[in-house]
Amino acid sequence: ANLNPAHQPEVWRDFGNNNQTSAANRPWMPCPGNHEIEFNNGPQGLDSYLARYTLPENGTHFPGRWYSFRVSSVLFVSLDADDVVYQDAAAFVGGPAPLVPAASTGRPPIEPGTSFYVRGYSNGEQTRWLERTLRHAAHDDDIDWIVVQMHQDALSSSKTGNGSDKGIREAWLPLFDRYGVDLVLCGHDHDYERSYPVRGCNHRAGVDAKTGEVVETLQPRPVGSNDPDRTKFDTSHGTIHLILGGGGTSAPLDVYGENPSTGFAQAKVFTKPNRPVPGTAPNTFVRQPADALEDAIWSARRDTGTGYGIAVFDHDPGKPGGHTTITMRYYHAPGADQHPTAQYELFETIELSKKRRER
């Protein structure tokens, strides 16, 4: 809603109307992202978001921002990545004119160059909660799978979108490795991308996007076979990241980075904040794109045909002494760029499998 700051209530109304048929028939368990952060809307800009969802308690000073819940033997963990990302991508006034809030609010104009940057707002409380939650799950025999959802991406090779963020890699990927997170679901970039299982990282494998000097990006390290056609995985050896950003957008971003020297997949990475700087026109401001590049050795599959699609997951809890599986089918809509009711086609199917815990 922060893209339409003078009409935020109407945007939320329209969003709810669009979703009500689905939400009336299945639970909607959201996570906040950069576009939920609005000026004049509470300390993290999330009051409109929090007012519209009743979410599980997290026992911290920040209710509703992050939470967990269990379905069968799957633990779902929902996070607010704005707390840890370097990218400044929330509410912003680019100028040259100030942003004038709706008259009914009585709020003063917001000057050009102002951005609502909330990195670090929980002072580590979210990360401490996450570690407690994952540690408990790792020792709970009733939990076979850990699935994390967040808005921003630790692993994205989008060329025209945002890219990857080192802040997530620093704060949370070590915890995902330590406690065996199986799957991470993200959005932010409006496309589809699947990683190989990753664990650990390669150091100083990135370069500055402008100077070419070596920089630290904490490049995620793939484990196992790097066959892009492989469809079955044991996630006890590494975490798979999925970008599912094609559920509905007017700006599909199905264009991906490529290293011009090698032809390999390439990713942009934010390794530091991109706070507003003066633009070329008087009294205007811009936020720079990601500052670093790395070879996306972790990228297994990218959908270059369309930015639109949906993922469907099926969980089989298995039988005692056997295996349990999660099957993901991604359906894309190649004609959606021209027709709003394009037919969905199966793009790929993957199966995650592991030995079921003894109950």
Task: Give residue ranges: language-model regions.
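Soluble non-cytosolic domains of exported or imported proteins
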Residues: P5-P9, G120-G124, K166-G167
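Metal-dependent phosphoesterase/phosphodiesterase active-site architecture
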Residues: N41-V148, D153-G161, E170, P174, ...
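Well-ordered, non-membrane alpha-helical segments in soluble/globular domains
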Residues: P9-R13, R128, R169
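Core catalytic region of metal-dependent phosphoesterases/phosphodiesterases
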Residues: A1-N40, R178
